[in-house]
């Protein structure tokens, strides 16, 4: 490490200050020490690159994370420090300054500073004689960045620079503060080095603002400084410091590395801790769930146990009841038999017959008597009824008479009221006449007063109008005054001659409340200039005029004010007059009243002059008074008559009341008698009916009871059966619970074992780390000791502090580790305790809930039992009967009481009424007579009443009987309803219990089914994983082999191209390659083609170089080249060498080749180097992926073993349980059969005990039977479920097959139409040209196509017929093609696979070809560059591409991209795409251009840019295989599908069948001749012919467009494009495909998504996202007819790849 103090000179110090002798001596000693040092050491120090670096300051490094790569880069770059802001010293600088400067400098600083401009290590120091003066304060440098976790090493010294506050070091980093403990302070005196610098004249001259920029100047200055001041004390000091710094540097670096390592380890441990915590959380969750399940199970157990106990008690009770009932039934049977015998005996006896006859005769006599009595009673009743009617008639007559009397009285009252009303009216009239007479006397005076009033009112109106006018004038005047005041403010006032007017004006202002204004003193505030602003005289005139007008206005104003004051005075006068008139009016009214009174009292009045009128009035008044007196007398008489009438009326009313009361009393007595008789009869009938009803009821009760008992017994038997079922279910549930518990235990054990192993591993790791740290620390301590001893020998100071500090460091590190471990343990403990507490609390709560539930259930059960047992108890029945009797007795007593109470009340009423009657008897004789007559009638009626009452009683009895019967019926119905309700409730309860039991059973069933399904699923998943792992391994191996083979081939070819190749060496190379290549796909043809391609690439670079060197020559030859190209375009079918690069003539190449050989070689080296680098990278990636895959495989295998073991255990346990249950069931069945044989013939004389003993084992046997049935049912369900799963899978497979077939048929129809149209178009085009051969070929193909397309799914027999039906022309075609395969090796494998193989081969070939594409990429780039140069000259319009079937000539397609050579036209193979070699050259520029260019928008944008690098993207065709030939042959790209091993194919087919991936072909084909004319998806073909043509005879002109659109991405510079650009390009290509893909063959429609989606073996990882997006876009743009099938089959690999879990086999394949 070097000291870097910047580039600013030291501050000049004062020379006047004193110099100390001691300092001088110390300085001399240091100089001697430094001179003694060897020169070699100095040279080494200076020459070492480390010294020329400066550390970055704290400010620079803090908060910047730096990588070690950046550090290394910055250390290797030798740059100058930049002068930056002075913020204090850097970390390391300050450290070494603090270590080496010592405290002597601190003590003697004040002395030395005064005399010498010395270099203080705190302020600055030169760097090993570098020749530039460092700054006084530290400057930041951006040379290099230390890592974030870099910590400087300070030996624990405190640095206190008292004189310079800016030089105090403050370590801001918190991590560094850990290392500075309190022990550091005591180590100050260990390392104090005194240094006395020597004064040099050269240093004083250093300018403070000097800055050096450049490494050359830096070195020059260094050399100068060394040469000038070799012997100076300063130089020696700096060298010494540098030596020490180097040592410290190394120590620091070691420590930093250790720190970094420790931090990494800590991070790793933290990461592990987090993982462990997550695992712990997961386990706690699972524990909780399992506990919950366990508790639920326990609760269920408890509930079921309670139910079992309840049912057992019920069973026992029922057994007891059964025994009792059997005893009772026996006794009843005996009694019945005895009664029957008695009845028979009685029937035979004669005495009984006699008794019966006697009884019958007695009954007849009684009935006759009863009938006679009834008849007599009816007669009496009729007589009483007639008497009553007569009395009612009399009463009605009396009522009518009373009503007439009331009417008469009302008429009299009305007459009286009319008379009174007439009298009142006459009185009022007379009073009015008197008033009129009084008023007529003062009429004249009133008239006069009214006249005066009218005048006064008029005057008032006039004055009001005047007031209004005055007020309006006032408002106007006020406005004018405001105007005048404003004028006065402007300085306008009247002249002195009119002073009087002014005085008046001011007074009037004061009156109106306007303030006085001093007109003379007021200043003019505004000057108006309107007329002529230039003339001064006009202003004065204007002012004078204004003043005159104002004076006139003021005068008029004063006049108006005078008028206003006058009018106000007039108004006041008017008001006074009005008030006077009002007073006069009041006086007159009072006088009138007085006169009226005087006239009434006095005969004459002085006021009124006419006396005759007053006399007349008086006479009238007297007459009226007399009339009033007469009327009053009449009124009194009428009142007296009214009083009399009222009295008579009251008497009549009283009499009537008495009559009514008497009648009511008599009526009541008769009713009472009737009631008594009725009651007696009612009671007698009641007793009779009650007895009969009770007898009936008892019979019905017995019948019902028997029926209920039967139903009860049936229900009990059903309940028993159900209970048995429940018990069986419970036992099964218990077994399941036990299995679950066992599983949980095993899981826990495994988890505990894993935890233990993890803990052990952790402990081992920690121990290892501690040992490593300890060893490293020991080594560092030893090294540091040695270094410090060396340093001490130079400076005579033993720096023991270094060692101490290292020990401290080690201690600190250990302490940190301990603290971290303790913290971790504490956190773990806390977490565990918290979890335990939570669990305990939850368990307690659940336990409490369980207990409460159990208690509630027990209480409910007990209550139900008690309720059930109550009605069966004999005591309960006896109590019920006793209570019934009591109730009946109480009811009878209460009824009797009520009757007696009613009778007594009636008697009392009657007595009271009698007394009232006696009191109110009138003395009238008439009334007495009437009463007597009535009494007589009553007596007569009383005699008749009993007969009537009897008849009524009979009616009442019949009615009462009916009512009672109805009541009885109602009661019976109610009883029946209650019983039905009880039965319904009972049934509902039973149904509920049954439903609950069924639900439990179904739940358990579903749980079991779910468990089995999960187990099956896990097994399936495991098998899938195994298969995927194996596939991945196989694919990886194949990829690796292909990569190695391609690398070897390329290496050999590239090494060969640099030398001049000889024919002999070619054969050797071929042999070497064939021997080295492990894979069988290598062939002579492939090797030749590769070689040809490389040669062509190197040849094509020459014209590029020529063009760059000589542009003028290029311009001259442009015309010639275009002519040549045109001439070549006209000649069809010419297979000359111009096809290689038609833009350059061969002669020119020959001349230029020698000159440009060197350039070519350089380009070769560059290209090859790039290729090799890429291949190496790919290899490394492959190896990494392999390692990861192996790890994943191991992990998977381990998991599989575990799972298998667990599943096997579970299966074994289940089987054991089932077998045990079956054995038990068989045993129980045997026992049951034995018992049944015993119980088949039970004797009649068996006792109750024997029956009981027989019943118990029967119930047990039934239970066991139920249990066996349940186990069988469970087994059956399992089998059914497995069968159902298999059937559903088969159904799904069939559905898939059916859909595939349907879709294929649809696509076949569409393809057929499309091909027919295309062929018709080709025929038409060929007709224009007039080529008869082509027409014949096309016609023959049309016929074959039509035949084949009519039968898309044909059997082998059909294919044979089609084969025979092929026309001669197609056979001729094949023969021609075969004849052209001269030089090609026929041993290339052509894989004709089975149906199931078709999908698998596609995916595999895709994976296999990925490295091939990468290897061939750079060659293709060179080809593109060369072709780009040749295409430049051709216009945008290019001719339509056509394929000639016979001779293979074709035209260029307009939709080709510009940077692709016209020689490589993409054609469609059977399984992928290849590039077709064009035979023809370009035709005229003016030839018609097709509108296909719109289909390639992104290719058009690329233009003339040659692609610098072409890396195959994920959407490129996966089955490309590029082959090259010699330069003589036509260059073409062929498509191969070579699978070397048929065994692997078979294996793959098996696997594909296992995965249900089936793709039946449209047409079966075994032979090439069979497959002609139809696109076969089952057979994949390899092109062997040199001619690039379609083996299947498709019209190529139309099919090239989609193939081009898919393939064109190979020619785009995808390596340098961003993701967004690529996605845009893909979108555009997909737009093109939308219109063209439906017409592609079936093979291509299935392949294109495959090319995009299946990319397992591709090593580049950054392409995965692009792959997904491309696939989505492709699937969205393709039409439904094409997309449906591939999407179904090819989305599966994508989803599997996306799985990034630890267990997944596709961990990092992307």
Swiss-Prot record:
Query: Using the chain's own numbering, where are the disulfide bonds?
Result: none
Q: Name one GO biological process term.
A: cell projection organization
Question: Which positions carry the signal peptide feature in this UniProt record?
Answer: none
**Localisation:** Cytoplasm, Cytoskeleton, Microtubule organizing center, Centrosome; Cytoplasm, Cytoskeleton, Microtubule organizing center, Centrosome, Centriole
Interaction with PLK4 as annotated region, ranges: 1-60
- What is stated as this protein's family in its record? Belongs to the CEP152 family.
Q: What does this protein do?
A: Necessary for centrosome duplication; the function also seems to involve CEP63, CDK5RAP2 and WDR62 through a stepwise assembled complex at the centrosome that recruits CDK2 required for centriole duplication. Acts as a molecular scaffold facilitating the interaction of PLK4 and CPAP, 2 molecules involved in centriole formation. Proposed to snatch PLK4 away from PLK4:CEP92 complexes in early G1 daughter centriole and to reposition PLK4 at the outer boundary of a newly forming CEP152 ring structure.
Name used for this protein in its record? Centrosomal protein of 152 kDa
- Origin species: Homo sapiens
Instruction: Give the gene name.
Output: CEP152
């Amino acid at each position: 490490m070097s000291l870097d103090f910047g580039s600013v000179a030291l501050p000049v110090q004062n020379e006047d200050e004193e110099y100390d002798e001691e300092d001088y001596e110390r300085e001399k000693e240091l100089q001697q020490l430094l001179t003694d040092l060897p020169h070699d050491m100095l040279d080494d120090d200076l020459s070492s690159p480390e010294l020329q670096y400066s550390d970055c300051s704290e400010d620079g490094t803090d908060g910047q994370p730096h990588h070690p790569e950046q550090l290394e880069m910055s250390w290797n770059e030798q740059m100058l420090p930049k002068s930056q802001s002075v913020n204090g010293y850097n970390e390391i600088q300050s450290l070494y300054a603090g270590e080496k400067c010592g405290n002597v400098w601190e003590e003697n600083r004040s002395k030395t500073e005064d005399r010498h401009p010395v270099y203080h290590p705190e302020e600055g120091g030169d760097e090993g004689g570098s020749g530039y003066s460092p700054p006084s304060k530290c400057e930041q440098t951006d040379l290099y960045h230390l890592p974030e976790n870099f910590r400087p090493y300070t030996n624990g010294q405190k640095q206190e620079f008292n004189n310079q506050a800016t030089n105090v070091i403050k370590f801001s980093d918190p991590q560094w503060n850990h290392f500075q403990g309190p022990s550091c302070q005591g180590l100050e005196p260990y390392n104090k080095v005194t240094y006395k610098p020597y004064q040099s004249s050269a240093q004083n001259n250093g300018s403070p603002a000097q800055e050096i920029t450049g490494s050359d100047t830096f070195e020059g200055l260094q050399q100068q400084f060394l040469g000038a001041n070799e012997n100076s004390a300063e130089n020696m000091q700096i060298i010494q410091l540098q030596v020490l710094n180097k040592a410290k540097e190394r120590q620091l670096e070691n420590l930093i590395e250790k720190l970094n390592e420790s931090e990494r380890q800590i991070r790793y441990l933290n990461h592990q801790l987090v993982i462990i915590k997550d695992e712990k959380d997961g386990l706690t969750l699972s524990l909780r769930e399992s506990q919950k399940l366990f508790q639920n199970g326990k609760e269920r157990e408890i509930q079921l146990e309670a139910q079992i106990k309840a049912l057992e008690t019920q069973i026992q009770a029922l057994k007891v009841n059964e025994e009792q009932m059997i005893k009772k039934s026996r006794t009843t049977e005996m009694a019945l038999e005895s009664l029957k015998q008695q009845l028979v005996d009685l029937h035979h006896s004669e005495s009984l017959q006699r008794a019966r006859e006697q009884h019958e005769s007695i009954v007849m006599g009684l009935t006759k008597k009863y009938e006679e009595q009834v008849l007599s009673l009816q007669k009496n009743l009729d007589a009483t009824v007639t008497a009553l009617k007569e009395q009612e008639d009399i009463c009605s007559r009396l009522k009518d008479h009373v009503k007439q009397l009331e009417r008469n009285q009302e008429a009299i009252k009305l007459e009286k009221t009319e008379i009174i009303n007439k009298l009142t009216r006459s009185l009022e009239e007379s009073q009015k006449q008197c008033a009129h007479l009084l008023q007529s006397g003062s009429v004249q005076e009133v008239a006069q007063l009214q006249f005066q009033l009218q005048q006064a009112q008029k005057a008032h109106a006039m004055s009001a109008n005047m007031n209004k006018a005055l007020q309006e004038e006032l408002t106007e005047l006020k406005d004018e005054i405001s105007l005048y005041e404003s004028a006065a403010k402007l300085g306008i006032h009247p002249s002195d001659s009119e002073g009087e007017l002014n005085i008046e004006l001011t007074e009037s202002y004061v009156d109106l409340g306007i303030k006085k204004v001093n007109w003379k003193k007021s200043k003019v505030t505004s000057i108006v200039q309107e007329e002529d602003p230039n003339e001064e005289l006009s202003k004065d005139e204007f002012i004078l005029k204004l003043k005159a007008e104002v004076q006139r206005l003021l005068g008029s104003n004063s006049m108006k004010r005078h008028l206003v004051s006058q009018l106000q005075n007039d108004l006041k006068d008017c008001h006074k007059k009005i008030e006077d008139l009002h007073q006069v009016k009041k006086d007159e009214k009072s006088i009138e009243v007085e006169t009226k009174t005087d006239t009434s009292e006095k005969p004459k009045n002085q006021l009124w002059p006419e006396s005759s009128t007053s006399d007349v009035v008086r006479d009238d008044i007297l007459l009226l008074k007399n009339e009033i007196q007469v009327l009053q007398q009449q009124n009194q008489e009428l009142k007296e008559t009214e009083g009399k009438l009222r009295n008579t009326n009251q008497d009549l009313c009283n009499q009537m009341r008495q009559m009514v009361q008497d009648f009511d009393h008599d009526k009541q007595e008769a009713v009472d008698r009737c009631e008594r008789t009725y009651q007696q009869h009612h009671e007698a009938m009641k007793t009779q009916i009650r007895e009969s009803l009770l007898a009936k009821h008892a019979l019905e009760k017995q019948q019902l009871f028997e029926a209920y008992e039967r139903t009860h017994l049936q229900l009990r038997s059903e309940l028993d059966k159900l209970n048995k079922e429940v018990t069986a279910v419970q036992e099964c549930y218990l077994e399941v619970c036990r299995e679950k518990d066992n599983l949980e235990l095993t899981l826990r054990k495994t988890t505990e074992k894993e935890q233990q192993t993890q803990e052990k591993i952790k402990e081992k790791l920690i121990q290892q780390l501690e040992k490593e740290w300890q060893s490293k620390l020991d080594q560092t301590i030893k090294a540091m000791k040695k270094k410090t001893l060396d340093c001490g020998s130079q400076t005579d100071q033993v720096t023991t502090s270094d060692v101490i500090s290292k020990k401290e460091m080690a201690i600190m590190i250990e302490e940190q580790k301990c603290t971290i471990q303790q913290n971790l343990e504490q956190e773990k403990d806390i977490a565990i305790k918290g979890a335990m507490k939570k669990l305990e609390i939850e368990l307690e709560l659940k336990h409490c809930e369980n207990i409460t539930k159990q208690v509630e259930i027990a209480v409910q059960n007990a209550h139900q039992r008690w309720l059930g047992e109550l009605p069966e108890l004999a005591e309960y029945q006896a109590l019920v009967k006793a209570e019934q009797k009591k109730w009946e007795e109480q009811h009878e007593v209460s009824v009797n009481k009520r009757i007696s109470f009613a009778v007594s009340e009636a008697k009392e009423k009657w007595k009271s009424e009698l007394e009232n009657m006696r009191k109110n008897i009138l003395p009238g004789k008439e009334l007495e007579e009437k009463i007597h007559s009535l009494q007589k009638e009553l007596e007569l009626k009383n005699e008749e009443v009993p007969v009537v009452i009897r008849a009524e009683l009979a009616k009442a009895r019949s009615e009462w009987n009916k009512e009672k019967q109805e009541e009885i019926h109602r009661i019976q119905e109610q009883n029946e309803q209650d019983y039905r309700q009880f039965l319904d409730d009972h049934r509902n309860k039973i149904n509920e219990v049954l439903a609950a039991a069924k639900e439990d059973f179904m739940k358990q069933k579903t749980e079991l089914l779910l468990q089995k399904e999960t187990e099956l699923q896990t097994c399936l998943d495991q098998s899938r994983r195994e298969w995927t792992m194996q596939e991945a391994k196989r694919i990886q191996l194949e990829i690796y082999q292909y990569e190695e083979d391609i690398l070897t081939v390329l290496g050999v070819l590239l090494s060969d191209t640099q030398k001049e190749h000889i024919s002999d060496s070619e054969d050797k190379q071929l042999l070497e390659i064939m021997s080295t290549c492990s894979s069988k796909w290598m062939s002579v043809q492939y090797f030749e083609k590769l070689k040809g391609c490389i040669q062509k690439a190197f040849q094509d670079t020459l014209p590029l170089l020529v063009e760059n060197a000589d542009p003028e020559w290029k311009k001259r030859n442009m015309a010639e080249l275009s002519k040549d190209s045109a001439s070549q375009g006209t000649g069809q079918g010419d297979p000359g060498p111009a096809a290689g690069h038609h833009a350059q003539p061969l002669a020119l190449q020959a001349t230029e080749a020698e000159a440009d050989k060197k350039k070519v070689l350089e380009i070769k080296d560059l290209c090859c180097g790039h290729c090799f680098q890429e291949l190496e990278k790919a290899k490394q990636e492959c190896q990494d992926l392999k390692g990861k895959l192996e790890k994943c495989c191991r992990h998977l295998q381990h998991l599989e073993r575990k799972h298998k073991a667990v599943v096997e255990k579970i299966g074994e346990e289940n089987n054991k349980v089932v077998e045990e249950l079956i054995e038990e069931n068989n045993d129980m069945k045997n026992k049951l059969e034995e018992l049944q044989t015993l119980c088949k013939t039970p004797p009649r004389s068996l006792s109750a005990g024997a029956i009981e003993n027989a019943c118990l084992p029967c119930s047990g046997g039934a239970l066991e039977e139920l249990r066996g049935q349940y186990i069988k049912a469970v087994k059956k369900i399992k089998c059914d479920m497995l069968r159902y799963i298999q059937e559903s899978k088969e159904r799904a497979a069939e559905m898939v097959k059916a859909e595939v077939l349907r879709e294929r048929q649809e696509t076949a129809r569409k393809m057929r139409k499309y091909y027919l149209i295309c062929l018709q178009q080709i025929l038409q085009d060929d007709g224009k040209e007039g080529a008869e051969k082509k027409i014949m070929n096309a016609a023959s193909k049309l016929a074959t196509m039509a035949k084949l397309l009519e039968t898309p799914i044909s059997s082998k027999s059909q294919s044979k017929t089609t084969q025979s039906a092929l026309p001669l022309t197609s056979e001729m075609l094949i023969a021609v093609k075969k004849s052209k395969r001269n030089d090609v090796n026929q041993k290339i494998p052509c894989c004709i696979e089975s149906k199931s193989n078709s999908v698998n081969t596609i995916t595999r070939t895709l994976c296999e070809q990925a490295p091939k594409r990468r290897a061939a990429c750079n060659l293709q780039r060179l080809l593109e560059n060369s072709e780009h140069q040749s295409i430049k000259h051709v216009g945008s319009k290019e001719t339509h591409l056509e394929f000639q079937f016979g001779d293979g000539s074709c035209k260029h397609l307009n939709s080709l991209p510009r940077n692709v050579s016209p020689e490589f036209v993409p054609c469609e193979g059977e399984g992928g795409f290849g590039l077709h070699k064009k035979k023809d050259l370009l035709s005229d520029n003016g030839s018609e251009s097709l509108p296909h260019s719109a289909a390639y928008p992104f290719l058009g944008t690329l233009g003339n840019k040659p692609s610098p690098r072409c890396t195959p993207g994920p959407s490129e065709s996966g089955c490309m295989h590029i082959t090259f030939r010699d330069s003589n042959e036509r260059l073409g790209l062929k498509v191969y599908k070579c699978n070397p091993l048929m065994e692997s194919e078979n294996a793959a087919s098996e696997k594909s069948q296992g995965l249900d991936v089936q793709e039946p072909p449209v047409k079966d084909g075994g032979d090439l001749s069979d497959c002609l004319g139809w696109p076969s998806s089952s057979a994949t073909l390899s092109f062997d012919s040199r001619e690039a043509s379609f083996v299947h005879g498709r019209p190529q002109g139309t099919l090239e467009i989609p193939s081009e659109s898919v393939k064109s991405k190979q020619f785009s510079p995808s390596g340098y494009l961003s993701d967004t650009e690529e996605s845009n390009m893909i979108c555009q290509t997909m737009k093109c495909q939308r219109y063209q893909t439906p017409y592609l063959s079936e093979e291509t429609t299935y392949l294109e998504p495959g090319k995009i989606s299946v990319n397992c073996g591709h090593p580049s990882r950054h392409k995965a996202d692009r792959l997904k997006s491309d696939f989505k876009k492709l699937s969205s743009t393709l039409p439904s007819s094409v997309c449906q099938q591939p999407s179904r089959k090819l989305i599966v690999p994508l989803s599997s790849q996306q799985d990034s879990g630890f267990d997944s086999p596709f961990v990092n394949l992307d």
